[in-house]
Amino acid sequence: TIVYFLSNQVYAWHKILLVLTILILAPVFIFASRQPVPSLKTLRFDRPPLVTLSGTLEYIEETQVVWEIPISPKAILFIAHGCHGRASFFWDKSPTCAECSGLPEERTITLNALAKGYVVIAISSTRECWSLSNDRTKVLSILSGWIRDKGLEALPVVALGASSGGSFVSALAREYKFKAIVVMISEGSFHKMEIDENYPSTLFVHMVKDERRATLIKNAMDKLRSKGIETHEVKCYESIVTPDYFTKIPGLDSETSHQIQKIFKENGVLDEDNLMTMDGRAMNWMTPLKKK
């Protein structure tokens, strides 16, 4: 899949959403429904998935900022992490980012974005979760200033936010002229804010078994469409945790992945179909691994 651009550097909306959908379709390691989604092995990478990411860490306005610019950049992706996340989770530890840790799903987003020609910049929230009062002014300043300093003003900017970051991005988009946004695992802030026809195209990514959130997202989509805003959704289903599932983690070989999967099955983390028995956030799934 490639990023399509018009000669005037403005995306066609449906093409933006198509590319962004691919960026966020990493396996969802969480309890959802009985229909599996593609694993990482079925996604096409433009370079090996275990390539080392080399983000550059800076502290701008006393805020952690990590970024990476590919050769011949075509667009800019701003990432807002979820609660308890950090910008440094999206890149591998390297000489230019000693604080980076490269979490598997986060680095997959960065990897795919860079491979598609996106400049990637992530900013950490002031506290554990995002809030407009703490982060709005600072992020607007950092993002605008960084893009200007790097001479990237001609590139279109899109945003991806997860959970708390999704709510934050949806609110920030009223002021910052994103070309499109992705709101993951969140209904956004649409229930408490007004929008007009200039609001960017919006893609919601959510888990089908979270019925309450699905209803809220439907309401948000209806509101956006009533203003003529293009909006779509990606429904995430549970992943089958195969014996090789964990080999996508850099440095983790097939034998270790098989052992982890076996321990999970023996301790009730996975059922007979290799599906998680409950929401991973609600189970102490590290305990059986520590015993070994």
Regions from the PLM with identified roles:
Residues 5-8, 15-16, 26-76, 171, ...:
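A domain-start/cap signature at the N-terminus of enzymes
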Residues 71-112:
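Short, surface-exposed "cap/lid" segments of acyl-processing enzymes
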Residues 73-76, 116-120, 153-156, 176-181, ...:
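Loop/turn elements at helix/coil->beta-strand transitions in domains of secreted/extracellular proteins
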Residues 88-92, 132-134, 171-172, 193-195, ...:
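Short, solvent-exposed loop/turn and secondary-structure capping segments
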Residues 110, 114-129:
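Conserved alpha/beta-hydrolase
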Residues 127-152, 157:
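Alpha/beta-hydrolase active-site loop
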Residues 160-169:
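Gly/Ala-rich beta-loop-alpha elbow adjacent to hydrolase catalytic centers
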Residues 179-277:
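The feature captures the conserved acid-bearing segment of alpha/beta-hydrolase catalytic domains
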